[in-house]
Amino acid sequence: MYIVYVDESGDIGLQNSPSNYFCLSAIIIHESKWDQTLNSIIDFRRFLREKYGFKLREEIHCSHFIHKPAEFQRIAKSMRLRLLRDVIDFQANLSNYQIINVVVNKKNKPIGSDIFNLAWQTLIQRIENTLQYRNFIGSTNIQDTAMLFVDKTDEVKLRNLTRKMRRYNPVPNSFNLGAGYRILPTKLIIEDAIHKDSAHSYFIQLADVNAYFLSQKFQPNQYIKRKGGKNYLDRLQPVLFKQASKKDLLGIVIR
């Protein structure tokens, strides 16, 4: 089984929204590599404590960490950004660790579009397809499944979506099949998504960093642009699951 940790960045609003994009970033790890990966993360958090004075019990929540630091004001802003770059580089060197990114461009969507469902359905479908073709690394099983662990989001809406996809899931035909859709219910995503407070999950905190820099790649704020953080996501290339999209060099699925 694969464990999938997901976090969001941006918002789903189509009117008067500060963001033009809604982003999801998912970390995928096989259960057999989970403990090994967790131990690596704990060692890395100890490194952050020694280098920056960032405690193991403290939460990385990017937008607050950079722009509304509160208790983290003890760490200079430039050093906080460097800490986040270290988080990116740490992940890029992990083995048996992959990331799928989904971005919904809200600028070209008509009023009334369901941005939340579009993003999550796209991500879930990519995970389902990859499980079917056994393209995730870290397993020799004949067939694996996956469970979703997500930061706080619209729990009811996500639950309704995943349950619906198990019964009715229209998927556009590939080019060789012509126009139209096929009904391909998902079978490999186990149970409803489990919602976790990111304060209690190092993995979701990593997904938060990835989702933040995913959104900054498309719509960077002035500070990130000035400091060169717009392309921090590119540093994750060794662990990006680029097969998720052939249309983007980093494999980002853009809708």
List where the protein language model places each region:
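Phosphate-ester processing/binding pockets and catalytic centers
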Residues: 1-255
